[in-house]
Amino acid sequence: MSDRLFIFDTTLRDGEQVPGCQLNTVEKIQVAKALEQLGVDVIEAGFPISSPGDFNSVIEISKAVTWPVICALTRAVEKDIDVAFEALKYAKHKRIHTGIGTSDEHIKYKFNSTREEIIERAVAATKYAKRFVDDVEFYCEDAGRTDNEYLARVVEAVIKAGATVVNIPDTTGYCLPEEYFEKIKYLKEHVDGIDRAIISTHCHNDLGMATANTFSGVMGGARQVEVTINGIGERAGNTSLEEIAMILKCHKGLGIDTNINTTKIYPTSRMVSSLMNMPVQPNKAIVGRNAFAHSSGIHQDGVLKNVQTYEIMDPKDVGIDDNSIVLTARSGRAALKHRLHVNGVELEEHKLDKIYEKFLILADQKKEVTDADVLMLAGADTADAHAVRLDFLQVTTGKGVKSVASIGLDISGQKFEAAASGNGPVDAAIKALKKIILKQMTLKEFTIQAISKGSDDLGKVHMQVEYDGSLYYGFGANTDIVTASVEAYIDCINKFKKED
């Protein structure tokens, strides 16, 4: 059994089926190039017959990338295969991915057919695709609900017809991990000629088991996995590329390797999230904002002593600069002391006790406490010499008029004021702030999130800015979203000022 696992990325095909996440051709090329840098083996670039846009995207992606196999999806229909081959004409390495439903539900209700007719159509499609390309992948749609004996007959028939990869999708996300393992194992043991083809997994996440099923399939003998960045995909999504890659990296004893450059995982995740306008849930494994963040006092104390106490991965392995100690109401004194130390503040124990009491009150109000907040608690006399703090903010806005903002900042004890107008209160406030902070900062990401449902409750703003070629993240929380936005921007400023 080969120890090489091939990564088939379907972000640009299955992943793009998420409502509202469609990309244009230029954006798809950006993602394809990032996937090439990431090290995926196969890029499923689209379903060419489905639309002129998909057809054109497959053509342009084929031109743009060099070494990955470019794959085009079809049904078991000759016209589909003709169009797919035409779209792949510029690809250095071509694959046609054809197939048909094999479960009784699909055979009876979708195709109004019989098991024998489905096998005939499967063989015919495989042979037809083989006339155009050497590399043909065949998918048995809804294989998860197809009985193993019949599935083995289909797989054996298409391998004899020339299929080089056989895809066993859990299309509905129904399988249990042990069932999927047994299904793959059954094919390995009962299909004549199975060693002439690679078995591929393609698992959906309807019951939250996509990654578990995919991993079980690998353990059963599959040597290609079909995955997406951030686990995006139709309905509840697909298996996450980053999760499979890091499972195998962390469990080296399995002896299964991929070609993935894991340090590219996080940047690729951010790119896909941004282009598709689909935020990654904060607690998403590997790439979520909180994946390497620790807020529990017990956990924080352990991580500060030795990261291996609560971290099984180095954040740098996935392209994140460092882990994050997130200060919340559950944080202990050790975490607060650490954040003060990082910001150059050393306090005697009795002073730390007083600040910790204030910190707990603030944390109950803000949920997450920033470095700027910690410095404010420590007092102006102990704050970083470059710390920027918001003194006041006044905004006038209304329908049919431009918003006007006046802002006051305290920078190292000096007071500064400015005013500006803008398209909306946040724009006006940020423009006023920029009149004081004369830095060429580019806003890269701006996210507003309500912490709870009430109109008078806190809103959170997460912001990413680029300054002098580096990215900085800021956070603000306030019952007023404009103030929260300004606090997030100031948080970014304070972070890059520490490096000046």
Describe the predicted segments one by one.
Residues R4-L5, T11, M246, G253-A419, ...:
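A mid-to-C-terminal "edge-of-domain" accessory segment
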Residues L5-I7, Q17-V42, F55-A64, E78-I199, ...:
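Alpha/beta enzyme core
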Residues D14, V18-P19, F47-P52, S103-E105, ...:
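Short, small-residue-enriched loops and turns at beta-alpha junctions
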Residues Q17, Q22, Q30-V31, E368-Y472, ...:
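Non-catalytic terminal/interface segments that mediate subunit docking, oligomerization
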Residues W67, P169-T171, E226-E234, K249-T258, ...:
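Short beta-alpha connecting loops at secondary-structure transitions
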Residues C175, F181-K305:
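Catalytic alpha/beta core domains of metabolic enzymes, predominantly
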